[in-house]
Amino acid sequence: MSTTAQIGVTGLAVMGRNLARNFARNGYTVAVHNRTASRTHALVEEFGGEGDFVATETAKEFVAALERPRRLVIMVKAGDPTDAVIREFAPLLEPGDMIIDGGNAHFADTRRRERELREQGIHFVGTGISGGEEGALNGPSIMPGGSKESYASLGPMLEKISAKAADEAPCVTHVGADGAGHFVKMVHNGIEYADMQLIGEAYQLLRDVAGYTPAQIADIFRTWNTGRLDSYLIEITAEVLSHVDAETGKPFVDVVVDQAEQKGTGRWTVQIALDLGVPVSGIAEAVFARSLSGHAALRDASRGLAGPTATPLGESEAAAFADRVEQALYASKIVSYTQGFHEVAAGSEEYGWDIDLGAVSAIWRGGCIIRAAFLDRIRAAYDARPDLPSLLSDETFAQEIAAAQDDWREVLIAATRQGVPTPGFAAALAYYDALRAERLPAALTQGQRDYFGAHTYRRTDRDGTFHTLWGGDRSEVTA
């Protein structure tokens, strides 16, 4: 087979198929391959008019169809399936060729694969892709890792197929070496979990405390989407809440089983944050909320537990409460992104990636699930101060939270009185209050640790590490 294709895509499920079409629509000749050849030929037959495809049935045909240096995109399930594809194709490649993994791989696997393939002279580019099947087709946010050399070759193609922000900037940048791209995509998904949880809590408050119907709440979200909460997730929330089930005539949200599933990237975000010592409490609560929702038997057994008598607000009070919920949602959102960017910064430092946080926020402005007008503000904050220790240290965000905090607290009081669970809002406020506190009970915790385990402590008034002889005369000794 002649060498004709500028890029190849193997793994033609929805994401792979749409990504291949995106490349073809943008003028590239695309070699396509799938484990089952029928899917390959079906793609070319159905979408061949969109651009130039080269259908291949075997690994050798696929590799032979690619121009040198070869660019091979893997779009298969993370884990063992990805390793299996690499084992199949790597022996057919030459030094200078590159394998691009566009799946949701764990960044540690990406680091391993990059190291192993580098020894063969093959570039491995772990690439986070966000936007779902629509984004893959029409322009996703793309987070490539790997070497700078590989990005010099691949970058122009990714820039062409990526989403474009409002200022027409492509939503792609070289994030950092080896696993940086998949690490940033992981944290993106963690923030997505937190965003969705906060939106869900806002919905529950508007329904159970304010007494609004799903259709009325949809209108409230549409109004919010014209302001500072303008985002893809707020937009689709209004669409979901306004949808009516054709079979029953009930609001769609009332006929969906209230058990939220998850694929694992949110859980990874929390696990890695624990390893790095980074508090991502909002993301953690979002993950735990999904887990709790799935324990149907436990929830059924607990429905008879005592709780407050719920009394929805009157119509005149409901509108004011909705405004307070908007404040609480926005303030909590700031905290969620603060925690997410803290984890990215910590990962960058731990693994030597030198990630530009402003650039990350810039490529999340379009194409991805968490795209929001709010990200322009984050980019501006990091561009002005690349060493910004926290988004809460930015003057603008600090002022906005200061203006929102009274309403934020009132919303949580109302939720507690009515028995509405708001773990995301509560975790965000607790994080904010902990950061601004003059003293934390951690001093007592450290004293307890010293008492039962001789774990020592540091003093506020002099340097050194100390231990109290709790079982003796309680004198203090230098550790």
Name these PLM-found stretches.
Residues 182, 207, 212, 219, ...:
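Interdomain hinge/lid region at the active-site interface
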Residues 402-403, 407-479:
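C-terminal amphipathic alpha-helical interaction region
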Residues 54-61, 78-86:
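Glycine-rich, highly charged phosphate/nucleotide-binding loops
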Residues 223, 348-381:
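Small-residue-rich helix-loop
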Residues 82-87, 100, 106-218, 226-251, ...:
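Rossmann-fold dinucleotide-binding core
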Residues 1-64, 70, 96, 133-136:
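NAD(P)+-binding Rossmann beta1-loop-alpha1 motif at the extreme N-terminus of oxidoreductases
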